[in-house]
Amino acid sequence: MALKVRVITPDRTVLDDSVEEVILPSSSGQIGILSGHAPLLTALESGVIRVRTSGWENIAITDGFAEVEANEVKVLVNTAAKGQDIDLEEARKAFESAKAQLDQVNAADRKAILDARKELKRTRARYMAAGGMA
């Protein structure tokens, strides 16, 4: 039995397909979802969603939520991009820049630290989805 997965951002649907398995980056760790999974509502963190059909596909996301019910997974996130649509070299440069920016943040500026960490997670997800950091 197939699992219907939809990844939706405020401005578009990134994925709407039947898959065999999906792995979500939840706030409590990665969650693997197969057909017949119990109903679930979970918060998602910036990371990579992995979906398996005949092979694996990566989707970089930022924070959001996922609902699993009746063999359907609805993922609502702020942004999402398929790994195949992300330029690997551009993603690598953005990730390196975010790492450097975090290293330069004033340790006393908590907001700046949080913002830099959030940007690092976002750029890391895009880099990983594009095939970097294997």
Swiss-Prot record:
Q: Which organism is it from?
A: Picosynechococcus sp. (strain ATCC 27264 / PCC 7002 / PR-6) (Agmenellum quadruplicatum)
UniProt membrane topology term = Peripheral membrane protein
Q: Name one GO molecular function term.
A: ATP binding
- Could you tell me the superkingdom of the organism this chain comes from? Bacteria
Q: Carries keyword ATP-binding?
A: no
**Keyword field:** ATP synthesis, CF(1), Hydrogen ion transport, Ion transport, Membrane, Thylakoid, Transport
Q: Function, please?
A: Produces ATP from ADP in the presence of a proton gradient across the membrane.
* UniProt name for this protein: ATP synthase epsilon chain
Principal location: membrane
Which family is this protein grouped under?
Belongs to the ATPase epsilon chain family.
Q: Taxonomic lineage of this organism?
A: Bacteria, Bacillati, Cyanobacteriota, Cyanophyceae, Oscillatoriophycideae
| Subunit structure comment from the entry | F-type ATPases have 2 components, CF(1) - the catalytic core - and CF(0) - the membrane proton channel. CF(1) has five subunits: alpha(3), beta(3), gamma(1), delta(1), epsilon(1). CF(0) has three main subunits: a, b and c.
NCBIfam families annotated for this entry?
ATP_synt_epsi
